[in-house]
Amino acid sequence: MFISVAVIVIAMILVVAPTGLWSYSPGEPEFEPVREVDPQAFIDNEARASAYDIYFPETPQDWVPNSARRKLIDGETSSVVGWVTAERGFIQIAQTGVPLAQALQKFDSKYRPNQEARQIVGREVTVKSSDDASVSRLWGVEKNGTTLLFDGVASDDEFTTIIANTLQADAYQPA
């Protein structure tokens, strides 16, 4: 058995190594640079195609945008932008036309039985969580027919900052 595993590993190394698609990087991943994306170009396109308002919040200068993509929430397309925060956390905002209660339930397959309400800039924000530490909190609020969902791993202050900035932002107007 050991010989067959060794043969497979050697064959894998011989086939993959020359392609350049293999890298070995010892050490902590937190020391690697964050790959930055241009979220404004993505939001510009999404605002043109969306049936609901899209919001592009101001973010602290030391936050780095690292993802912009689409995601299905309950069968409907949503726009998602994510940032690495100053404290090396991660927050993403998903914007959809799916009603809040439905979107909170269908955001992903994770079970979040706990629910609480928080006040942020005078608006009630729903926070769904789980006793399982591997399940991230999900924060949700509706604004002018758009459901805003925030998830990730970051401090309450960072979540409050991005949620407040989003709630205070005007609907994005494409260039």
Residue ranges and their predicted role:
Residues 17, 42-46, 162-165:
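Residues that form generic nucleotide/phosphate-binding pockets
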